[in-house]
């Protein structure tokens, strides 16, 4: 009976694995999925035949972000409407992985956790509920968490009910691979123990079977240890040789025979993640070396439950494996781990670990999180032309460091839960609360480091933009001062300067957009500062472009080109203004450090030199024509002094309305509130950081608020006075004074009279008496 039930459950799970949502996958044999293994080409499921296929372009390998995974799903399934991705619940075994540049390979098998590409509108999974099992679900609309978080929630809930997690699925998507709830099925411990080995049910509380050795290692004999070690060694040799064959041959790989001499395999094996030995070394030395290695998660991001032998404790403990890399101290089950490493004494292992193992420096683990100063290295290194690449690497190192620390905490959490099985519920909750606080602390620390990274990157980008703008302005003024000036060369230099200014504006808008996505309140606070900074950019461009019309001959010749440039960029200016005025849009969370906006076109927008600043001033203002500029009969531009500010003076050319413009003055200009149209202007240092405040534009708002406050206070006072007068108005009730010595009948009658009752007989006699 039990074997039949197990077969039925297996068949049902298989049908569900091939099951396709009815909304967009009708008629497909398999669900769209992708799988990644770092160092090999990505794999995707062929929805027509249900087989895994390599990346069609032959170039794409493992992807580090959820946004990238979603984009890759949309690339490999262009005919489907992929709207989201979610990590699969179970790992799968996939064959024929290829290196980059090859599209068809054989014999390469890896176990990975794929990502499901969700089609159309999200539909929750239909979970099978076996007999004696319970279907539960949890939703929290105030949180938006990953697949791993909800898996942990489901597992903890089942554990509190003394049951095992049988199956689960996500509910209520709120972002890319993020959800607001989980549905799950909890089954009694006895039901789960029928389908797995009894030792696993007692020692391993994991609800997922990750594959592995099915042989019974209960005896733990020396012969079986030798057999296991040799089998693993041969498998590693075969994989390494197959990798070498890919680099030499163009055809399909052929599986290597196990009889190949160890000497040849050892010469080609250079990775420290695997331990090879020659025929002269004993198997005991191999086992000691394998079991003495520290647990390695590897560079990949999967969270696969595995076991490794801990030298200090002398037993096998659980940890999370990333899915690639690592070393051979990595076992599917605790029983398998103890069968290999349990027969080796702790003293010999400690002796082995005290001696440094030979390592190839070229094959050290690729996870940079092991270095505590991974981010500090970026912060201490000055910025250069490769700032963006350095920032991306530092961001990746930071995320790798965070993942490694989270993996360590999850391993400790898993071990603590296993040890707290028989403790009271209060102690279990204390353990859970402790690790939840630890996880929150790590998340907060990572968020602070991300913020520091972004701020440093912003400051360096601002410095680079200022340098480029200053250099472009110097070249533009030099071209104007040339004798004779070349109009087209002047226009090219002007165009480069305008582009530099637009880079500044684009960077400002990117920063504002990022703040608006992650913190709308802060965006509302800095909005006026951003507008002020944009005004400074426009005024600076206005002053710079006015220099062109000091040379009428040059300005007249390139007037059409300048007009065309302005007309081309006018539409983009309208979009910028609309974005600044519009309400902040809702984003799916904080996955992106810096939103990647498309490269924008350059824009030339001029503002009036004087007058109050308003949103209308941001509209494109066509440059004044050549006829409106006083003629410069000498066809010269005012000489520009590049000396420091202390060594140069301000001289105004009569009738021009412009000062003797310098590079630093235009690049760092901040218009004073008192200057007139025909007078010189004061030059101040104005950085890209938003510290300026538009005081003038707030006067009207302050006056309006004061008047409104007076009106509201008046209304409140009048209302209070009226209410108080109403309280003192007299309330008349018909109360009849009753003697305390009267009879109960008379007292009852008096109460009736108080309530409005009038006896017709009494009324008749009263009228008679009157």
Curated annotation (Swiss-Prot):
Site (Reactive bond): 301-302
Positions with a binding annotation for Cu(2+) 2: 677, 685
Tissue: Expressed in the brain with expression in cortex, cerebellum, hippocampus, olfactory bulb, neurons, astrocytes and microglia (at protein level). Expressed in the retinal lens. Expressed at a low level in muscle cells (at protein level).
Residues under site feature: Implicated in free radical propagation: 704
MF terms (GO), sorted A to Z: heparin binding; identical protein binding; protein domain specific binding; protein kinase binding; RNA polymerase II cis-regulatory region sequence-specific DNA binding; serine-type endopeptidase inhibitor activity; signaling receptor activator activity; transition metal ion binding
Record: glycosylation sites: 542, 571
Binding-site list for Zn(2+) 2: 677, 685
Phosphothreonine PTM sites in chain numbering: 729, 743
InterPro entries from the UniProt entry: Amyloid_Cu-bd_sf, Amyloid_glyco, Amyloid_glyco_Abeta, Amyloid_glyco_Cu-bd, Amyloid_glyco_E2_domain, Amyloid_glyco_extra, Amyloid_glyco_heparin-bd, Amyloid_glyco_heparin-bd_sf
Cytoplasmic topological intervals: 723-770
Binding of heparin, residues: 96-110
Heparin-binding: region residues: 391-423, 491-522
Signal peptide: 1-17
Binding site for Zn(2+) 1: 183, 186-187
Record's keyword annotation contains Heme: no
The keyword Signal is annotated on this UniProt entry: yes
Region (Required for the interaction with KIF5B and for anterograde transport in axons) residue spans: 756-770
Subunit structure and binding partners: Binds, via its C-terminus, to the PID domain of several cytoplasmic proteins, including APBB family members, the APBA family, MAPK8IP1, SHC1, NUMB and DAB1. Binding to DAB1 inhibits its serine phosphorylation. Interacts (via NPXY motif) with DAB2 (via PID domain); the interaction is impaired by tyrosine phosphorylation of the NPXY motif. Also interacts with GPCR-like protein BPP, APPBP1, IB1, KNS2 (via its TPR domains), APPBP2 (via BaSS) and DDB1. In vitro, it binds MAPT via the MT-binding domains. Associates with microtubules in the presence of ATP and in a kinesin-dependent manner.
Protein purpose: Functions as a cell surface receptor and performs physiological functions on the surface of neurons relevant to neurite growth, neuronal adhesion and axonogenesis. Interaction between APP molecules on neighboring cells promotes synaptogenesis. Involved in cell mobility and transcription regulation through protein-protein interactions. Can promote transcription activation through binding to APBB1-KAT5 and inhibit Notch signaling through interaction with Numb. Couples to apoptosis-inducing pathways such as those mediated by G(o) and JIP. Inhibits G(o)-alpha ATPase activity. Amyloid-beta peptides are lipophilic metal chelators with metal-reducing activity. Binds transient metals such as copper, zinc and iron. Rat and mouse amyloid-beta peptides bind only weakly transient metals and have little reducing activity due to substitutions of transient metal chelating residues. Amyloid-beta protein 42 may activate mononuclear phagocytes in the brain and elicit inflammatory responses. Promotes both tau aggregation and TPK II-mediated phosphorylation. Also binds GPC1 in lipid rafts.
Name of the protein in its database record: Amyloid-beta precursor protein
